């Protein structure tokens, strides 16, 4: 972390003596720059190109040094469009990596990869900045205590609980609800834990980023009247940005989260949507730098790049960063090198199912595919563990019986199997839940359900005490008491119709 004596623009540190070079070659977003002998910049240094294009428009492009080519040449990747750049333009070496503003000034604001505000709400206090390239915390600083991070979402807390300071992968194809689940988590964490969140939009749609910002303002996570009371900082590098920006925007978001953890000693939630786009941008840059591709055309440095990002996301004795990362799965193939490399770093996986989304069960979390290293009796306790296992057994049995049901019908099943199917269908519906951020779509007020209440509800269904209630009573409710109240209302409505 650096305290800047001046309030110079973010992204570039203030230096008295600056070395300068000239552009020798431009290949799309990659620049080759020639420097005088003995004045070469270091790897990862930020270079700034300032000048005017042929039309007289001002140019200000920041690049990051990636390779030293020899003969006093370096190869750098641009963080913004290189339109208008020409050979021979002056390039200034800032003498330090990209630095971005950190701390309370970032809350409620939207930044780009350079830490520049892009929300038209005026300048940001840049007296405190931090470089985006840092080493991971030392072993001695790490906190190894295992504790559950309660989200208030029943299916997550019961079947695939999140670890405080852990890394969670949100797997799903296009349009099954990854972003809605992320928005609900930001909302719940802000309200229930009072913690701050940092959202890194890596290579996703500009429209989604805009929708997220608007919904955060509506739900109060971003406070427009008093911006300092906001609970989230947003960092965007959308699909239309050059690959350099998409590759580094995750590090910008992580740097902001690290400050809240290390200096403010807070528990932080870091969202990365989408980690696959980080890999994809790295692959593009790797090809532009002339590296030989590896499996399926990915960069040969895939594991190293992923590791250098993921190892910085951890709990220390000062605070924790719990990270939730949306993982796009290309062609729904989990063996693709990008999702497969991500898997190795995760403590829990929340898998979203297109089949459940088609049934209208939201959140469409697959209860049998989602996993967590925290679901052990020694960590969550015997009651929670046994309830979760029985729920999974019931759902698994229902899945096995579905072929028989579709061919022969329910009547051909034994009495015991029919009971299992009835309970499984109730469980499946009870795993759905109305979200605060989806109130406008569902018309139902959002619900936050505590872990103890979640366990009690599923134990009652499994025990058979609620066998007499209709299964639609369990759909889109919070606690089990709401389900029984809904059943009574349904019964009253049917009596009135008679």
Swiss-Prot record:
Localization (cell): Plastid, Chloroplast thylakoid membrane
Recorded catalytic activity of this chain's protein: ATP + H2O + 4 H(+)(in) = ADP + phosphate + 5 H(+)(out)
Superkingdom, natural source: Eukaryota
Membrane topology: Peripheral membrane protein
GO molecular function, one term: ATP binding
Residues that hold ATP according to the record: 172-179
Keywords, sorted A to Z: ATP synthesis, ATP-binding, CF(1), Chloroplast, Hydrogen ion transport, Ion transport, Membrane, Nucleotide-binding, Plastid, Thylakoid, Translocase, Transport
Gene Ontology cellular component annotations, sorted alphabetically: chloroplast thylakoid membrane; mitochondrion; proton-transporting ATP synthase complex
UniProt-listed Enzyme Commission number(s): 7.1.2.2
Pfam family, one: ATP-synt_VA_C
HAMAP family: ATP_synth_beta_bact
Function, as annotated: Produces ATP from ADP in the presence of a proton gradient across the membrane. The catalytic sites are hosted primarily by the beta subunits.
NCBIfam families cross-referenced by the UniProt entry: atpD
Quaternary structure annotation from Swiss-Prot or TrEMBL: F-type ATPases have 2 components, CF(1) - the catalytic core - and CF(0) - the membrane proton channel. CF(1) has five subunits: alpha(3), beta(3), gamma(1), delta(1), epsilon(1). CF(0) has four main subunits: a(1), b(1), b'(1) and c(9-12).
Protein family membership: Belongs to the ATPase alpha/beta chains family.
Name of the protein in its database record: ATP synthase subunit beta, chloroplastic
Organismal lineage: Eukaryota, Viridiplantae, Streptophyta, Embryophyta, Tracheophyta
């Amino acid at each position: 972390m650096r305290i800047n004596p001046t309030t110079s623009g973010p992204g570039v540190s203030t230096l008295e003596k600056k070395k300068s070079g000239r552009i020798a070659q431009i290949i799309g977003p990659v620049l080759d720059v020639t420097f005088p002998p003995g004045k070469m910049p270091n790897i990862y240094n930020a270079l700034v190109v300032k000048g005017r294009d042929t039309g007289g428009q001002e140019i200000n492009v920041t690049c990051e040094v990636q390779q030293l080519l020899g003969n006093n040449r370096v190869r750098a990747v641009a963080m913004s469009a290189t339109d208008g750049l020409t050979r021979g333009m002056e390039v200034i070496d800032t003498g330090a990596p990209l630095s971005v503003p950190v701390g309370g000034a970032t809350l409620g604001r939207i930044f780009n990869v350079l830490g520049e505000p892009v929300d038209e709400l005026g300048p940001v206090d840049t007296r405190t900045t931090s470089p985006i390239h840092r080493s991971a915390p030392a072993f001695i600083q790490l906190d190894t205590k295992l504790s559950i991070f309660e989200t208030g979402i029943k299916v997550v807390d019961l079947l695939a609980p999140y670890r405080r300071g852990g890394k969670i992968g949100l797997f799903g194809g296009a349009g099954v609800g990854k972003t809605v689940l992320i928005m609900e988590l930001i909302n719940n964490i802000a309200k229930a834990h009072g913690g701050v969140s940092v959202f890194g939009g890596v290579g996703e749609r500009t429209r989604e980023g805009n929708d997220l910002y608007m919904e955060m303002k509506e739900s109060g996570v971003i406070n427009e009247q008093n911006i300092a009371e906001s609970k989230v900082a947003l960092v965007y590098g959308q699909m239309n940005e050059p690959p350099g920006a998409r590759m580094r925007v995750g590090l910008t978001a992580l740097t902001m989260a690290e400050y809240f953890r290390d200096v403010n000693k807070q528990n932080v939630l870091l969202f990365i949507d989408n980690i696959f786009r980080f890999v994809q941008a790295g692959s593009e840059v790797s090809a532009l730098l002339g590296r030989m591709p590896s499996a399926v055309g990915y960069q040969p440095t895939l594991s190293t790049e992923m590791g250098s990002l993921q190892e910085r996301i951890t709990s220390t004795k000062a605070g924790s960063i719990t990270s939730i990362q949306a993982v796009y799965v290309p062609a729904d193939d989990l063996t693709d090198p990008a999702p497969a490399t991500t898997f190795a770093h995760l403590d829990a996986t929340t898998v979203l199912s297109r089949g459940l989304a088609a049934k209208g069960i939201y959140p469409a979390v697959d209860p049998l595919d989602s996993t967590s290293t925290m679901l052990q009796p020694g960590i969550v306790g015997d009651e929670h563990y046994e309830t979760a296992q029985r729920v999974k057994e019931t759902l698994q049995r229902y899945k096995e019986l579905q072929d028989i049901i579709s061919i022969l019908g329910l009547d051909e099943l034994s009495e015991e199997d029919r009971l299992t199917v009835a309970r499984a269908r109730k469980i499946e519906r009870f795993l759905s839940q109305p979200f605060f951020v989806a109130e406008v779509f569902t018309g139902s007020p959002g619900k936050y359900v505590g872990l103890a209440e979640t366990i009690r509800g599923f134990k009652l269904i499994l025990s058979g005490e609620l066998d007499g209630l209709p299964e639609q009573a369990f759909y889109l409710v919070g606690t089990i008491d709401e389900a029984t109240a809904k059943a009574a209302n349904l019964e009253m409505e049917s009596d009135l119709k008679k």
